[in-house]
Every structure is written in C-alpha cells, then in structure tokens.
Design a protein with these regions (language model features):
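Short glycine/proline/serine/threonine-rich loop/turn segments at secondary-structure transition edges
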Residues: 108-122
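Short beta-strand elements
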Residues: 131-159
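Surface-exposed loop/edge segments in extracytoplasmic proteins
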Residues: 72-85
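Short, surface-exposed binding/anchoring microloops in extracellular/periplasmic proteins
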Residues: 28-75
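Secretory targeting and sorting signals
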Residues: 1-27
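Short proline/glycine- and polar residue-rich coil/turn motifs
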Residues: 39, 84-100
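Aromatic sugar-binding surface patches on proteins
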Residues: 43, 94-111
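Hydrophobic beta-strand positions in extracellular immunoglobulin-like domains
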Residues: 48-51, 68, 106-108, 126-128
C-alpha cells in the first residue's frame, strides 16, 4: 500500500512538472518549399510556419531567416533573406496554432557569383517572442515566451 502511494505521488509530481514546463516550452514548426530563381540574383523561398498559442501574452517580435548556398564552379554563391516584425507593426504570422505561408526573398551576395539553375542548399530558422506589456511605458516584462525553430540544410533545385 505504501509503495503504491509513493509511486502515485511521484507520478503526479512528474505530471505537474511536465505540465508546468509545457507552458513555457512551446513548439514552433517551419518547413521550406520549392524555391524560385529569378534573374540569377533573387531566390524566392516559400516557407510554412506554425506558432503555438501564447495565452494572454502579447507577441512582440517575430523573425524568419533563410540562407541559400550553391556551388558555382570553384566558388559558392550565397545569400540570406530575413522577414522581421516587431510590436506594434503587424505580425508575420499568428501564434494560434494555424499554418501560415510566407515567401522570403534571398538575394545573391554581390561579392560572390550569382545563383544558377540546379542543386542548392537551403537552411532556415524562425522565432517568436511574447511577453506582458509594461505598465510603465514601452517594452515588455515577464513572463516571457519564446519559440524557436531551425531547419537544417535541405537540398533543393533552383530553376
């Protein structure tokens, strides 16, 4: 009987810790679609993002960054594109569990070669931050919620 109570209490304690951590460790998702190359300089990369709800907090900062790299002879063509939004500007995507599609334009680094049709590597990351608006003016105070996601190198075809 004593063993059953101890196991039950330990199980409930683990469940309570899991539920408490679940409120702060949100899962955000990000997927990269098939990119489109224009004029060998711009690559439009479609991304799909899902941000989980943040309760009564206010989302104040969001960012999606996409990197493209491609072998170009003995050099590497590369570029980075970023979408960013900060309160009070409109957000990039809602944090309500719904899926949102966005396009990130990546420009080739002018110090290197241009992109070309063929295989390339795309990686991406995203973040969303939420907090409680400060009662003393601008800014946000605790509690905070931050969701991060990374997409490791994915091979795609530019064309």
């Amino acid at each position: 009987m004593f063993t059953v109570r101890v196991r039950t209490m330990i199980g409930l304690a683990v469940l309570a810790v899991t539920l408490a951590l679940g409120g702060t460790a949100q899962a955000m998702t990000l997927a990269v679609g098939s990119p489109d190359l224009a004029a060998r300089i711009a690559v439009t990369v479609p991304v799909t993002v899902t941000c989980n709800p943040v309760g009564s907090l206010t989302v104040f900062s969001q960012m999606i960054t996409v990197r493209v790299e491609q072998a170009a002879g003995r050099a590497i063509a590369r570029g980075t594109g970023t979408l960013f939004a900060a309160f009070p500007s409109p957000l990039l995507f809602p944090c309500d569990g719904s899926t949102q599609e966005l396009s990130v334009i990546v420009l080739a680094d002018p110090a290197g070669p241009p992109f070309h049709g063929g295989k390339a590597i795309v990686s991406a990351n995203g973040s969303s931050e939420a907090g409680t608006p400060s009662p003393f003016g601008s800014g946000f105070v605790a509690p905070f919620d931050r969701q991060d996601v990374s997409v490791a190198a994915v091979q795609v075809k530019l064309g």
